[in-house]
């Protein structure tokens, strides 16, 4: 791939407040550079020091990094520990037993608080219940549960006994669940009768039954069911058991099972691509270390913070920054069952006000949706709520366009909260490129600089470094402790996907394009490699065109894809959601012309969309991610044959198909 061209440079720079910087875990750029220099001088020693200081080991490690079978790297492999002990028991010994671990808000607004001592007891009972079903160290367990204290406890219980969990997002279909059960060779499924989202009871147990009825799931011995609503469900005798019955007679003590540092803590299947799902396999020690360090460095977590990451446990963000990271550092966190638009679009801000949230971490898609909602219904505008408890904001899941960044900064953060625009992936285990809120000057739309110990670069197809200002492939040149260890049952695919021979077989290929600012070296993610457009020989990232569209005052949200074009090779097709009612006919044509001219002015004529389609919304997963693969099919005017079970709003496809 030749370099990606970037036509617009963001010039705005924002510094964190002085008092924030003075009290930050990493205070000032000199402190950041000192950590980077330590990693450069003694890479293995840098990570070993951090692992010794942050993790509790039942058997200390003597080995640091093993690269003998690259790219199947190993860290601290002769050490042993238990992840659950590091998340729970440590707080019973350091004076935080009675500190609130989780503030759970149900869909209907009911609130439950649970301390570290109480959560420890619940996890131990759960773990003892799993052991009574002969679930042992190394067994795989599927978790298909809603956002809940019990969903988090299920993951921690697996970690406590050394079972490898694989959480499947509650929005996935029976077919998707079936594929994952078979690939993982799971012995049990942990689920709920229903999940409650946006005032609706959605079946989970019935979907599990449907998946198991498809056949081939011979490894499954038990289905454990958390009674969320008490609604009717079918029960298979001897296979199915209620969670409350499984745990009611169990002791609240369960000795944590020591596991090797490289023991698979979890498998998480990546969604969205065609073909067999990829089971991303993560280690225990290296993964947990990075979850802790990024909580401290990127979120600057303090003992009195109230932290809220809005992600579902079915996604990697809900693993690292809900189930593991916050608990390992002893944080008090919000866990929310519902959705941002129910009962109205002020729900998030009402919760920030009610719980005095100080750190808030959400996705750009949610931010853009809430911008549109606030303009449509001023009563839900964040200015109507007291958000003064906030001190730090975060963005995750996709690049945040500068205009959404600015709205977030002004309206949610009151121009006083740093924003950490975090770039990372399921495969990286945690943040890899992100501002440090006490050190890094912020630029809207840029994830800024790699974290200490992450050796990121922008290269061409042959792996050669590109100069700043030239876009190319984002890579990480050295193995880091939290990185993906394998694709479950598919090592060949692991090597081919992430460590291609073209790059030497040892360099991690992120699958994203990036460009570095000529002066600061800041990274901007230009989108997935397969989201790069080639217009008349010019390679352009979709993210830049989308940002230009969203910068227009009329536009709430935009997604851009390429479609074949006889003249230019590829042309730009934009799907746009306005802040007002969807236009039709001549009005739609007029607004489309205005937007094309706008993009030409913002970026250049080469970036003008040839086609613009207007919709009431964009096709999104239930976690809020835009399903661009479906937009590519719509742009080509082809019929959709892919699995759309994770699509939140299927009706939008027909609207966008006809909106030409």
Swiss-Prot record:
Origin: domain of life: Bacteria
Keywords: Acetylation, ATP-binding, Ligase, Magnesium, Metal-binding, Nucleotide-binding
GO biological processes: acetyl-CoA biosynthetic process from acetate
Post-translational modification remark: Acetylated. Deacetylation by the SIR2-homolog deacetylase activates the enzyme.
Keyword Magnesium on entry: yes
Coiled-coil regions listed: none
Ligand binding (Mg(2+)): 550, 555
Residues with PTM N6-acetyllysine: 625
Any Pfam family: AMP-binding_C
Residue ranges crossing the lipid bilayer per the database entry: none
Catalyzed reactions: acetate + ATP + CoA = acetyl-CoA + AMP + diphosphate
GO cellular-component term (any): cytosol
Binding site for ATP: 397-399, 421-426, 512, 528, 539
UniProt cofactor(s): Mg(2+)
Matches recorded under InterPro entries: Ac_CoA_lig, ACAS_N, AMP-bd_C, AMP-bd_C_sf, AMP-binding_CS, AMP-dep_synth/lig_dom, ANL_N_sf
Binding positions for CoA per the UniProt entry: 197-200, 317, 536
One MF annotation (Gene Ontology) recorded for this entry: ATP binding
E.C. number(s) listed in UniProt: 6.2.1.1
Xref: PROSITE patterns: AMP_BINDING (PS00455)
Entry function: Catalyzes the conversion of acetate into acetyl-CoA (AcCoA), an essential intermediate at the junction of anabolic and catabolic pathways. AcsA undergoes a two-step reaction. In the first half reaction, AcsA combines acetate with ATP to form acetyl-adenylate (AcAMP) intermediate. In the second half reaction, it can then transfer the acetyl group from AcAMP to the sulfhydryl group of CoA, forming the product AcCoA.
HAMAP family in alphabetical order: Ac_CoA_synth
Family: Belongs to the ATP-dependent AMP-binding enzyme family.
Name by which UniProt lists this protein: Acetyl-coenzyme A synthetase
Native source species: Herminiimonas arsenicoxydans
Upper lineage: Bacteria, Pseudomonadati, Pseudomonadota, Betaproteobacteria, Burkholderiales
Gene (UniProt): acsA
